[in-house]
Each structure stands twice: as structure tokens, then as C-alpha cells.
Amino acid sequence: MESNYSDNLVNEFKTTYKLEGTDFWQLKRGGKSQWIIKHNALEKVAAQDKITWTLDVLNFSPDIVVKCIATSGDRTVESLGESSSKNTMMQFPYAMAEKRAVDRCILKLLNAHAYIYSDAEADDFKEPTSNRVKSDAHNKLNKIAENKING
């Protein structure tokens, strides 16, 4: 049931928000598959749904904690995003904490939290190389088409 619901959500997001197949991928772990969505795709969805948010940094050091309060229509949710040297290999821990908090709120407002995860959730949620190659090729084709259209 959970897998079907997750699959349906991904298909609904692709259709409703005009997202590409390269905005998602399946992470295979422990014999199960989990849908992952790109942070940038979630920001596109938020813009289309007019989701707004405010951020508050609750802790600076050594661990960073950012609180996000997000609103869509008459619904408001909140979530925390954390980042530390133990769960973030990137050199931008504040940005990662912010992305995690915002993405969790967006997914909650879309009733997709716990069914689809953001790529910002964990370093091991990163996009597979094969998907990145497809995405790069897709972007190059779009640029070629734009150049032909714009002269």
C-alpha cells in the first residue's frame, strides 16, 4: 500500500507541477525502495502552490538547528532541520539545515511526508550518477532548443 501511494504521489507531482522524471529517483536500501525528490523540485512546487515560510535559527554551534514554519492556504506546519558534522559532509551546514527544514514542511503540506524524502535529508540520498547524466543531457537539449527558437 505504502509503495503504491508513494508511486501515485510521484506521478501526481510530475503531472500537477510539471516535474521531470529526473527530479525523482528511487533509493534502494535493505531490500526496499524509497522515492527521493530534488530540493529544487520542491521549491518549484512550493512556488506553484504559493507555499510561504519563515525560518529561525535555534542553535548555531556545534550543531545547527533551523526551525521552519510554512503555510499554504489555511494550513500551517512546522519542522526542524538539523545539520552537524555527523550527518552532513557538505561544507555548508547552515544551508543544509535550512533545506532540510523547508523540504520537510513542503512535504508535510503536500501530504507526502514519510512517503517521499528530499535529497537534502542525508548525504547518502544523493542522486545516482546515471540519473545525473540523463539530467545533464536533458538540460543540454533544452538549451539547444532555446537557442534555435531565440535565433
Q: Whereabouts are the PLM-identified features?
A:
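Polyanion-binding surfaces on beta-sheet-dominated domains and ring/shell assemblies
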Residues: 1-151
